[in-house]
Regions:
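Short hydrophobic/aromatic beta-strand micro-patches
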Residues: 80-82
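Catalytic core of pol beta-like nucleotidyltransferases
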Residues: 1-62, 68-74, 84-155
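Catalytic activation segment of kinase domains across protein kinase-like and atypical kinase folds
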Residues: 77
Length: 155
């Protein structure tokens, strides 16, 4: 993470973040994207997932979807997490919904969004979650937000 400028860039003409992975501090993320009650509610759900992922050893979460666009009231958020160092037994015991990627409704009920491992294959696209998250519905490239869970304090 050293050397990354931690400033979320302005949106492009389509309301998306410019191409790339944009590292942000939690406070900046909340300030930028938590600008109404709906968004703050989604952030609360995201925080629950982030606490569980950090406790299980995940180092990074990537946030995507309409939540990181100019849409004023997104329906949910989409996220994927670095699972290289995750203790899956910890998740299985403490956060089983994070391991059930097919129960999207269950994830949305608990976390108010959908969360996948970065290397989770997506349908028949031949790509994983991390790659898919960097494209819009028309498959044009766009940016996403990254939060360093190792630096993140949730107290």
């Amino acid at each position: 993470m050293l050397g990354y400028k931690r400033v979320i860039p302005e949106f492009d003409e389509n309301g998306n973040l410019p191409l790339g992975v944009h590292w942000a501090e939690w406070e900046e993320f909340v300030e930028r994207f938590g600008n109404n009650e709906r968004r703050l509610s989604l952030i609360q759900g995201l925080q629950i997932a982030m606490k569980q992922l950090k406790a299980a050893g995940s180092r990074t979460i990537y946030i995507n979807g309409s939540f990181v666009t100019t849409k004023s009231k997104p329906g949910d958020f989409d996220a994927c997490y670095d699972n290289e160092t995750v203790d899956t037994d910890c998740l299985r015991i403490n956060a089983p919904r994070l391991l059930n990627h097919y129960d999207r409704a269950g994830q949305k009920a608990k976390y108010r969004g959908e969360i996948f491992p970065v290397n989770q294959p997506v349908g028949n696209y031949g790509i994983n979650s991390f790659e898919l998250f960097q494209r819009n519905r028309n498959r044009n490239k766009k940016g996403i937000i990254a939060i360093d869970l190792m630096r993140w304090n949730y107290d």
